[in-house]
């Protein structure tokens, strides 16, 4: 019915429902897109697709996006490919308590890439993270 199919913006202001967390995350996500000009970066580059662990990793320039859709498996020391060598910091995660997450990640942590050489002279860079189930996290390469 039209009554139930309409948008109910007041739900995000309702204290006993979790829509407020979703609204807060939406604001933070849009702020990240504006701050780092994600829409001006062109196409995203797929770095990793792990069907078994239900994880996708892609980047837009210095930003690395990690999505883990697995219903149960959180993976410590999970190696993800990164586009550039260096230090990375977490800039956004659905796991944050301010977004209704469980707070299982250290949002102030720093992550360091390491090289891996393959046959034929190919060198790729990786970093290890705690890949939390049902979470999305964004990392940014630190300059200098």
Where do the PLM segments sit?
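Carbohydrate-interacting/catalytic domains
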Residues: 1-144
């Amino acid at each position: 019915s039209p009554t139930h199919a309409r948008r109910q913006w007041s739900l995000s202001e309702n204290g006993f429902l979790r829509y407020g967390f979703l609204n807060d995350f939406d604001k933070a996500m849009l702020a990240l897109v504006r701050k780092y000009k994600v829409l001006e970066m062109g196409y995203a580059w797929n770095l990793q697709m792990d069907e078994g662990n239900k994880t996708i990793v892609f980047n837009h320039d210095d930003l690395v996006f990690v999505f883990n859709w697995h219903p149960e498996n959180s993976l410590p020391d999970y190696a993800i490919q990164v586009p550039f060598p260096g230090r990375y910091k977490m800039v956004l995660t659905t796991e944050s308590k301010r977004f209704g997450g469980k707070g299982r990640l250290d949002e102030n942590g720093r992550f360091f890439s390491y090289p891996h050489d393959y046959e034929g002279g190919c060198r790729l860079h990786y970093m290890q993270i705690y890949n939390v189930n049902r979470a999305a996290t964004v990392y940014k390469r630190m300059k200098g």
